[in-house]
Amino acid sequence: MTQQPLRGVTSLHFNQDQSCFCCAMETGVRIYNVEPLMEKGHLDHEQVGSVGLVEMLHRSNLLALVGGGSSPKFSEISVLIWDDAREGKDSKDKLVLEFTFTKPVLAVRMRHDKIVIVLRNRIYVYSFPDSPRKLFEFDTRDNPKGLCDLCPSLEKQLLVFPGHKCGSLQLVDLASTKPGTSSAPFTINAHQSDVACVSLNQPGTVVASASQKGTLIRLFDTQSKEKLVELRRGTDPATLYCINFSHDSSFLCASSDKGTVHIFALKDTRLNRRSALARVGKVGPMIGQYVDSQWSLASFTVPAESACICAFGRNTSKNVNSVIAICVDGTFHKYVFTPDGNCNREAFDVYLDICDDEDF
C-alpha cells in the first residue's frame, strides 16, 4: 500500500504471515516486529537513498527494494535484493540480485521459492532466491496500483491479479503451469467495476476482492471459483487500502479511506450484522441485494486522512481476537474484539518514534 508521504513514509507492507511489517521511507527503510512492537532494524538514507517499495521474505535477511521518493539511490524500474547477512562494509556488497525492466515496478511479492514483480500491464515470475530465472510473464489489464497476491503456503503456489475483463480476477497455479507456456489462467468475474483490492488467505483456498466502488467485499473459492459470501463495508463509495484474513481464516479485516477498519466473521457468518430490513420480510428487487449483505461484526476508527494496512494479531484467548492497524502517519493501533462485536483499543503507539541503533 502506497500513499503520498506523511512523516516520510512512502509505503507499508506486512511480511507473509503478518508478524512483521516493513516501512519504505524518504529516509530509507525500517523493519518492525508486530507483537511486541519493536524495530528489528533499518537501512539509512546513505545506504539505500529514499525508497518507494520494500518487501521482506518471511523473517529472513532478504529484502526487495525499489527506489522512489525524492532522493532515490536506486531506479524505480529495478528491484534490488538486499541480503543483510552478507559480509562487507560497502552497501554494494549486500546487493546480491537485480531485476531491471523498461517501466516502473509497482509491486513485489515473494515466497520461499519465487519472486513476483508487477508492472502496470505485465507480471513477471522468477525462481528465487538461488540462480533466478524467468518462469512466467502475464499480460494484464491496466493495473496502476500493481494489484497482486501470492500464496505463501508450501502446498499451494497460487497467484492472483486483475483479469483482462473489467472487474475480473485471474488465478494461476504456478505449480501446475509449465514455465515458458502461456496456459490460460482461471478467471473469476468478481465485480462490475475495476478491482481495487485483492487478498488470498494463508492456504490459498479463498480469495477476497473489492472493486473501485468499495462498498462490497466478495469472497470466492479458488478451486471451484464459486462465490462464498458477500460482505458489506458500507453504503458510501470508498477506496479500500487493505484486506487480510486471520491466520485460520475465521475472520477478515479491511481498511479504507473512510478511516474505519471493519472486522467480519467468516467461519460463523451468523456473527455478522444484517440489515434491519432483513427481519421485515419480503422486499423489492432493488434493495434485495442490499438486505442480503452481511455487515461487519465490529469496527474501529483510525485517522481518516492517513492510509493504513490491517491484519490480525496473535489470539490471546479463545474468545478474544485482535486486529492491528498500521498507518502512514506513523501510528500503530491494536484493538481486541469478541464474537459478540465488542471492540476495544488495547494499544496505541507511534512506531516512527521507536528507534533502535542497530542496523538491519
Swiss-Prot record:
A motif (L/FRRG motif) lies at residues 231-234. One of its GO terms (molecular function) is phosphatidylinositol phosphate binding. Signal peptide: none annotated. It comes from the Eukaryota. One of its GO terms (cellular component) is phagophore assembly site. The keyword Cell cycle does not apply. The keyword Cytoplasm applies. WD repeats lie at residues 4-42, 190-230, 235-274. Keywords: Autophagy, Cytoplasm, Lipid-binding, Repeat, WD repeat. One of its GO terms (biological process) is autophagosome assembly. Component of the autophagy machinery that controls the major intracellular degradation process by which cytoplasmic materials are packaged into autophagosomes and delivered to lysosomes for degradation. Binds phosphatidylinositol 3-phosphate (PtdIns3P). Activated by the STK11/AMPK signaling pathway upon starvation, WDR45 is involved in autophagosome assembly downstream of WIPI2, regulating the size of forming autophagosomes. Belongs to the WD repeat PROPPIN family. PANTHER family: WD-REPEAT PROTEIN INTERACTING WITH PHOSPHOINOSIDES WIPI -RELATED. The L/FRRG motif is required for recruitment to PtdIns3P. Interacts with WIPI1. Interacts with WIPI2. Interacts with ATG2A and ATG2B. Interacts with ULK1. May interact with the PRKAA1, PRKAA2, PRKAB1 and PRKAG1 subunits of the AMPK kinase. May interact with NUDC. This is WD repeat domain phosphoinositide-interacting protein 4. It comes from Mus musculus (Mouse). The lineage of its organism: Eukaryota, Metazoa, Chordata, Craniata, Vertebrata.
